[in-house]
Amino acid sequence: MTLTIKEVTQLINAVNTIEELENHECFLDERKGVQNAIARRRKALEKEQALKEKYVEMTYFENEILTENPNAIICGIDEVGRGPLAGPVVACATILNSNHNYLGLDDSKKVPVTKRLELNEALKNEVTAFAYGIATAEEIDEFNIYKATQIAMQRAIDGLSVQPTHLLIDAMTLDNALPQVSLIKGDARSVSIAAASIMAKVFRDDYMTQLSKDYPEYGFEKNAGYGTKQHLLAIDDIGIMKEHRKSFEPIKSLL
């Protein structure tokens, strides 16, 4: 008895590798519906394989440290919010567990919102330790954004419940005695930094969404404090509020 296209599709969708797909008895079924199902499954498997390969690439720096010190406790650190006109700069320090596997981890700006939220929940529930650090708009104005970012990162490290032995940091160096590696575009090169990037992004977006409830005119729930047209028009219309960065243009010139 010939299987229906629906039945064959169910069999195809249960296949876990491209090799298995190509050797499947249904592979030679010439019905268009079956061939379409095979093409869709191949595309999905190729995408999954690419994510696996990227994940392995992004463990390079962690593995380098673990080769020298198998007992190393590696902390990834990243920040979000250096560019906005309002709100804090937020850092996250994250220590992944030893059997981590979060396919799709990447620079938080490249990860779709739904996937970002999914990864954030998994990370919060499963990592060995994580902590956030915040530097306020007032501190950004007092020290400058670079120094404020360092302050936020160190606060995140200080908040960890587990003491790390090594730091992997996105494009920054810290005044910290622990061994550290600063990586340009680290959130796309290290799983530890990428995890911190995701968590910091979700935390700050939530913070700005809450802030928008008190200051709806600025549209913080949509722009996260960046200088969008709506945001700039609101500043022209009603002025600034306490979480605007007075050292940032165009606000600085308005004061």
Swiss-Prot record:
Q: Which GO terms describe its cellular component?
A: cytoplasm; ribonuclease H2 complex
Q: Which domain of life is it from?
A: Bacteria
User: Which residues are a divalent metal cation-binding?
Assistant: 78-79, 170
A Gene Ontology MF term for this entry? manganese ion binding
In which broad location class does this protein mainly occur, judging by the first location in its UniProt entry?
A: cytoplasm
The entry assigns this protein to a family as follows:
Belongs to the RNase HII family.
Functionally, this protein is described as follows:
Endonuclease that specifically degrades the RNA of RNA-DNA hybrids.
Spell out the protein name for this chain: Ribonuclease HII
Organism of derivation? Staphylococcus aureus (strain MRSA252)
Q: What would be the name of the gene that encodes this protein?
A: rnhB
